[in-house]
């Protein structure tokens, strides 16, 4: 499941292989296989209402697709203005109080564990405080990191800390599927049959993985 890049190039100070402007962004957002506008890193452009940035945000709104954020140290009026522009998530939250402020303003916080940034230990109390607004994610995850687990690693850590099973599973699966309007994970008629089979609801060791109804992993290969 993919989104449309919002900042290509990431800054005006680099030479990129391509430029995705607001017109191209709008065209990409019309595609059914692209589900959101990704990581609006240009928060100065949002706060200063840069015309090109705002056209990209408006294109996502017109397409009915959510807009991912990137504003780690945001607070106060600037954070409120950023959210009011239509940006609904942030995966760059580092501090618990910042996470609480974002949730109080209606934002969804993605708790991140990656090869570089690891924020679970700081942010996990949000699971209990705002279960409807929390999601798990990875970011810049190297193969060696993924060999030790993906979202399931955060699920296990949460359960070891005593969090409610259904709040944890909600952050791992239900909340993301609902927020990004992804037709998977519910096993409803017409949805893609994408699911995993685990040994039990405590260890959550993956025994099999199914994608579109086909077993792609059976515990051995």
Describe each model-derived feature in a short phrase.
Residues 91-92, 110-117, 130-149, 190:
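Short acidic/histidine-rich active-site segments
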Residues 146-162, 166-221:
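Active-site microenvironment of metallo-dependent hydrolases
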Residues 49-50, 76-84, 101, 105, ...:
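Histidine/acidic-residue-rich catalytic or RNA/ligand-binding cores of hydrolases
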Residues 39-97, 113-117:
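Divalent metal-binding pocket/active-site signature
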Residues 1-66:
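Divalent-metal coordination cores built from histidine and acidic residues
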Residues 33-34, 64, 81-89, 103-110, ...:
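Glycine-enriched alpha-helix->loop->beta-strand junction motifs that scaffold or abut catalytic
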Residues 2-4, 36-39, 67-69, 89-91, ...:
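Hydrophobic faces of well-ordered beta-strands that scaffold small-molecule active sites
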């Amino acid at each position: 499941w993919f989104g449309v890049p919002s900042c290509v190039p990431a800054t005006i100070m680099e030479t990129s292989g391509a430029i995705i402007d607001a017109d191209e962004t709008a065209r990409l957002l019309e595609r059914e296989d692209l589900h959101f506008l990704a990581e609006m890193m240009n928060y100065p452009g949002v706060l200063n209402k840069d015309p090109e940035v705002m056209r990209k945000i408006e294109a996502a709104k017109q397409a009915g697709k959510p807009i991912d954020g990137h504003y780690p140290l945001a607070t106060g009026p600037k954070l409120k203005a950023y959210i009011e522009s239509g940006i609904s998530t942030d995966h760059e939250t580092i501090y618990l109080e910042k996470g609480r402020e974002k949730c109080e303003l209606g934002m969804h916080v993605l708790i991140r564990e990656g090869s570089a940034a690891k924020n679970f230990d700081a942010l996990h109390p949000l699971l209990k405080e705002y279960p409807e607004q929390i999601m798990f994610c990875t970011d810049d995850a190297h193969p060696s990191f993924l060999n030790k687990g993906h979202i399931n690693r955060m699920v296990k850590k949460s359960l070891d800390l005593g969090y409610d099973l259904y709040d944890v599973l909600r952050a791992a699966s239900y909340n993301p599927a609902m927020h990004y309007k992804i037709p998977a994970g519910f096993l409803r008629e017409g949805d893609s049959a994408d699911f995993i089979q685990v040994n039990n609801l405590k260890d959550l060791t993956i025994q099999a993985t199914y994608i579109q109804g086909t077993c792609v992993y059976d515990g051995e290969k």
